[in-house]
A protein has these predicted regions:
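Active-site beta-strand termini and strand-to-loop segments that position acidic
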Residues: 76, 81-87, 111
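Short, mixed charged/polar active-site loops
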Residues: 90-92, 115
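Glycine-rich beta-alpha junction loops
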Residues: 1, 47-53, 87, 97-100, ...
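Glycine-rich phosphate/pyrophosphate-binding beta-alpha loops
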Residues: 75, 93-103
């Protein structure tokens, strides 16, 4: 498409190879690992598969006379980045907007006493009644629910996109600015 999402998604695929959109996958994991609050990224290696999916889609859906048929995509269908932190933790970050598959954020946090996976959210903790099977989060929400979500979660679900995530992020930014608190954005640029 030459309008809307078609342009901003297509042009980077023509010019770049790598993870074109790392924030959704890396942001939540970096927050859980206290990146820039006790740990930091130290080493990264990244590689992409070959590009095939967009070319195949274009060849099946774009008229032979359309100038877009001459475009050559550079971004591989799947990019995988491995990141090592100063404390020895590892992160695997993947980006794939081409392959046919159900939506998943593929977030997984694994430690010595359990594992959390997201989308759909599920958890397995050492010694839990379910044994070595995934369990839902409902049993843990009352004890570990974010005070911010408790306060504005219903409003966020009603007014915000992505299940309330967009609203919560904007609400938290405004709260930090009003109260003079440090935001993640300030941390990234070294203060304001």
């Amino acid at each position: 498409s030459d309008e809307g999402e078609g342009l901003w998604r297509r042009f980077p695929h023509l010019q770049l190879d790598g993870n074109l959109y790392p924030t959704h996958g890396l942001g939540p994991v970096a927050n859980c690992l206290d990146i820039n609050r006790g740990d930091r990224f130290e080493y990264l290696v990244s590689m992409s598969s070959l590009e095939a999916g967009l070319t195949e889609y274009r060849d099946e859906h774009v008229a032979p006379s359309d100038p877009k048929r001459q475009e050559r995509y550079r971004t591989g269908d799947m990019n995988t980045s491995l990141i090592k932190t100063a404390l020895g933790r590892t992160i695997m970050l993947q980006h794939d907007v081409v392959s046919p598959r159900p939506y998943s954020r593929i977030n997984l946090i694994s430690g010595t006493r359990g594992t959390f996976a997201d989308y759909p959210p599920r958890i397995m903790l050492e010694g839990q009644p379910e044994g070595d099977a995934w369990a839902g989060l409902d049993a843990y929400k009352s004890e570990f629910e974010s005070p911010l979500w408790t306060r504005v979660g219903e409003l966020a679900r009603k007014l915000g996109g992505h299940g309330g995530m967009d609203f919560i992020m904007n609400y938290r930014m405004v709260q930090c600015l009003r109260e003079g608190l440090e935001t993640l954005w300030h941390r990234r640029i070294g203060g304001a």
